[in-house]
């Protein structure tokens, strides 16, 4: 199978033998469907089943972290008994679960443009006609996206309704003052952190989350970009009231949320945030002892988040050193 994005067929020897059959083999075997008919958009999911001892219910994958959804890179380790092989989890109705998952992924793909354009329109409208409500509006958009990932509607109009209602409710805090706005921004970060810790699907299968065709879990580039606003605004607002340690706390929270291996797993977003925080602190404080201590504390928190979270996009890039990390970011 040729991957046009990665430049065609991979180099090296074939690791697996592939056979075609008109009937399901008795096993052990991995049975899967593959795309046929020339070039196709990478937006369809194909069936796969592992016929062997210990596999019941739906398949699980460390590559996707979504039960029932696996990546093509999982096939070879499973067939060869290597690290990174597929697992499984019990399910009374695996076919129904897979149908629901596929429908949910399709619904999110269809709703993504609607939710994004409506979100931007609401933020621009609030910034134009009610500037005091811009930060609450941002919070409303991000919290609505998280709520939609948790409740999993399959109709775009429900997504739009939840988004509008959440932003409208958030505008009630427009006149609440900078401290409340700062706490609201920090609360958005905490909500995403907790959501990814409880059930990664709440973010992964949200309208603004990953598309499940190249990136499966954590934060999408779009969502990571929107999540730049809460940490930067929250850190500055709480710093003005509570001092440098409030700034450091919000910065640490955001870096763990965005870059932590068990959470956002977005190395590029974490680097952007880190640079932004350092620039903000340097402009306000200059390069003094407090900045050095705060920066060291943030670095320690981020390192712990990467170390204890297992393998992710970020740790895989870091394993190849600075050159590999630069290639991944580029």
Question: Model-predicted segments: where are they?
Answer:
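Soluble extramembrane regions of membrane proteins in the secretory/endomembrane system
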Residues: 1-105
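Generic recognition of stable, solvent-exposed alpha-helical segments in well-folded globular domains
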Residues: 43, 70, 74, 142, ...
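Core alpha-helical transmembrane segments of integral membrane proteins
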Residues: 99-211, 224-236
């Amino acid at each position: 199978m040729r991957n046009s994005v990665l430049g065609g067929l991979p180099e090296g020897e074939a690791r697996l033998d592939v056979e075609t059959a008109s009937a399901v083999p008795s096993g052990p075997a991995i049975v899967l469907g593959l795309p046929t008919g020339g070039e196709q958009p990478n937006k369809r999911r194909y069936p796969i089943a592992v016929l062997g001892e210990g596999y019941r219910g739906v398949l699980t994958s460390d590559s996707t972290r979504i039960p029932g959804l696996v990546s093509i890179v999982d096939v070879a380790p499973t067939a060869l008994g290597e690290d990174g092989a597929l697992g499984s989890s019990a399910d009374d109705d695996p076919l129904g679960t897979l149908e629901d998952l596929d429908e949910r992924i399709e619904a999110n793909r269809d709703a993504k443009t609607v939710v994004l354009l409506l979100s931007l329109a609401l933020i621009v409208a609030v910034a134009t006609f009610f500037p005091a409500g811009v930060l609450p509006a941002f919070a409303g958009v991000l919290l609505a996206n998280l709520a939609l990932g948790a409740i999993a509607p399959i109709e775009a109009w429900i997504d739009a309704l939840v988004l509008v209602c959440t932003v409208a409710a958030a505008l009630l805090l427009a006149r609440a003052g900078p401290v409340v706005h700062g706490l609201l921004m920090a609360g958005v970060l905490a909500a995403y952190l907790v959501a990814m810790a409880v059930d990664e699907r709440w973010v992964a299968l949200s309208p603004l989350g990953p598309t499940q065709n190249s990136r499966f879990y954590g934060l999408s580039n779009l969502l990571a970009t929107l999540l730049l606003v809460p940490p930067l605004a929250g850190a500055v607002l709480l710093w003005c009231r509570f001092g440098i340690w409030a700034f450091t706390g919000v910065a640490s929270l955001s870096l763990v949320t965005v870059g932590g291996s068990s959470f956002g797993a977005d190395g590029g977003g974490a680097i952007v945030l880190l640079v932004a925080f350092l620039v903000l602190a340097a402009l306000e404080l200059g390069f003094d002892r407090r900045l050095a201590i705060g920066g060291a504390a943030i670095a320690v928190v981020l390192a712990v988040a990467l170390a204890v979270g297992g393998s992710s996009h970020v740790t895989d890039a870091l394993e190849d050193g600075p050159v590999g990390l630069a290639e991944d970011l580029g």
